């Protein structure tokens, strides 16, 4: 973080300073990540109140506290009405001090892939900061912005949400030059209520654009009519591997089990791209990243080089060669209807006997059964050879697939999966489920067993 004094923060955050005025160059909300002299922000959540950990923060080396009430502790304290809001305001101030060119993105699925692709491209152009992991909520976005320093030329900020208004808040802190909605699908329906609710929440990202900013959206499933009032007269770019009239599209597509080759078509010209990631949906992700990067000046050569240097991310269609002719695709990090059906299409293009291993999709509310059935029907239409499921909801996937088996626990599923592997000369297995399903346990079991 750039250096700032407590007296400066008092003005920035409209707070009250008690104690000495010191200079700060680091901030944390986690007592496990304290650095000497840092500012400890005492956030209050539904299940915790970090004010209770102030003594621990002092013992760990914190130099000052950001609190919502005075504490009986010998440390300088900046007292504000709401530490969560103040944390965001501090991040917004840091963002305003740094001249880096900033882009932001959201979507129902593929956010992390697009973020990684965009960061890889912009890293060809200059020093690039990007969201670590999935720190994309109303706490994670400020954490990322606070890492900005004058050394950065670019920043790629991922915005997520599970309720209305969250992205409107985080994009107001981020102030991007360009903003992208990667796609829309049934995700977090418990918080949004419907796909229309998802669209409204994702469209909030465009409210943070300046008048000369660029709104970027997927031409295949955008919600343009509802977003038009938010976008106003700002420039709009559309991307799609399917729509030839899009601003960013792909031609000459050639898909293999290890990656994709295609010609990227853009408003400034075309370039041949080698994308070392499996799946047609990653072509759309690459188009999104190309558009987002080009909005802040990336060249075609930078786009080509950045995409070519990509590495697969564990848990996100990460290829694991169990043995010769035995390929495991670890897509266990998370799941919703959109990413599940995309994974089905990836598996459909893989060699040998194709097995889809699924856990539950979470946070779908009243639409849960219908969404799980939709994935099963997609597997059936794609010709997947076998579907194995585990969990409370995923039986709907295996049943709808017509080639499914459901298991009471992962141990039974893994036993069956090992038998299938032993029976097949060539096999590809794709493992996927929501974070709460912990399907990485299946992946680990197969890896530990080697050739099974």
Curated annotation (Swiss-Prot):
It holds the Pfam family Mur_ligase_M. The keyword Membrane does not apply. Pathway: Cell wall biogenesis; peptidoglycan biosynthesis. GO terms for cellular component: cytosol. Its EC number is 6.3.2.10. GO terms for molecular function: ATP binding; UDP-N-acetylmuramoyl-tripeptide-D-alanyl-D-alanine ligase activity; UDP-N-acetylmuramoylalanyl-D-glutamyl-2,6-diaminopimelate-D-alanyl-D-alanine ligase activity. It catalyses: D-alanyl-D-alanine + UDP-N-acetyl-alpha-D-muramoyl-L-alanyl-gamma-D-glutamyl-meso-2,6-diaminopimelate + ATP = UDP-N-acetyl-alpha-D-muramoyl-L-alanyl-gamma-D-glutamyl-meso-2,6-diaminopimeloyl-D-alanyl-D-alanine + ADP + phosphate + H(+). One of its GO terms (biological process) is cell wall organization. It is found in: Cytoplasm. Keywords: ATP-binding, Cell cycle, Cell division, Cell shape, Cell wall biogenesis/degradation, Cytoplasm, Ligase, Nucleotide-binding, Peptidoglycan synthesis. ATP binds at residues 107-113. The keyword Zinc does not apply. NCBIfam families: murF (TIGR01143), PRK10773.1 (NF008041). Involved in cell wall formation. Catalyzes the final step in the synthesis of UDP-N-acetylmuramoyl-pentapeptide, the precursor of murein. Belongs to the MurCDEF family. MurF subfamily. Monomer. This is UDP-N-acetylmuramoyl-tripeptide--D-alanyl-D-alanine ligase. The gene is murF.
